[in-house]
C-alpha cells in the first residue's frame, strides 16, 4: 500500500512540490492502480498462449535506397540565415 509519506518521497525525488491535497489524491490514485494490477494477477491464464503483439504485425521494413536529393545550393536557398554554404541556426547556450 502506498502511503502519503511514500508519495511525498516520490515527489521529492522528482523535485516536485506537492500540496497535502495532491499528496492524498496521488496516494489514492497509486493504490487504485496497484489494486487493478492485483486483479490482473488473479486472472486465470492457463491455456492462453503468450503473445508479444496483440495484432500480430511483423516487421514492415523497406530497403534503404538512396534517391535523388537536393543540391547544397537548393537546400540553403530559402534558409533565413546561412554562412559559408551551411544553414546557420540560433545560438543555444
Curated annotation (Swiss-Prot):
Pfam families: GatC
Keywords: ATP-binding, Ligase, Nucleotide-binding, Protein biosynthesis
GO terms classed as biological process: glutaminyl-tRNAGln biosynthesis via transamidation; regulation of translational fidelity; translation
Reactions the enzyme catalyzes: L-glutamyl-tRNA(Gln) + L-glutamine + ATP + H2O = L-glutaminyl-tRNA(Gln) + L-glutamate + ADP + phosphate + H(+); L-aspartyl-tRNA(Asn) + L-glutamine + ATP + H2O = L-asparaginyl-tRNA(Asn) + L-glutamate + ADP + phosphate + 2 H(+)
Top-level class of the enzyme under EC nomenclature: ligase
Domain of life according to the entry: Archaea
EC number: 6.3.5.-
Keyword Ligase attached: yes
Statement: the UniProt record of this protein carries the keyword ATP-binding: yes
Single annotated GO MF: glutaminyl-tRNA synthase (glutamine-hydrolyzing) activity
Quaternary context: Heterotrimer of A, B and C subunits.
Family under the similarity heading: Belongs to the GatC family.
Annotated function: Allows the formation of correctly charged Asn-tRNA(Asn) or Gln-tRNA(Gln) through the transamidation of misacylated Asp-tRNA(Asn) or Glu-tRNA(Gln) in organisms which lack either or both of asparaginyl-tRNA or glutaminyl-tRNA synthetases. The reaction takes place in the presence of glutamine and ATP through an activated phospho-Asp-tRNA(Asn) or phospho-Glu-tRNA(Gln).
Protein name listed in UniProt: Aspartyl/glutamyl-tRNA(Asn/Gln) amidotransferase subunit C
Species this protein is from: Methanocella arvoryzae (strain DSM 22066 / NBRC 105507 / MRE50)
Upper lineage: Archaea, Methanobacteriati, Methanobacteriota, Stenosarchaea group, Methanomicrobia
Amino acid at each position: 500500500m502506498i502511503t502519503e509519506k511514500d508519495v511525498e518521497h516520490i515527489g521529492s525525488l522528482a523535485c516536485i512540490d506537492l500540496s497535502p491535497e495532491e499528496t492524498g489524491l496521488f496516494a489514492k490514485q497509486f493504490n487504485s492502480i496497484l489494486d487493478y494490477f492485483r486483479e490482473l494477477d488473479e486472472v486465470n491464464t492457463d491455456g492462453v498462449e503468450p503473445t508479444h503483439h496483440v495484432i500480430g504485425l511483423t516487421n514492415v521494413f523497406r530497403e534503404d535506397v538512396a534517391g535523388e536529393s537536393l543540391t547544397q545550393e537548393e537546400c540553403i536557398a530559402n534558409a533565413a540565415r546561412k554562412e559559408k554554404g551551411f544553414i546557420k541556426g540560433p545560438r543555444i547556450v
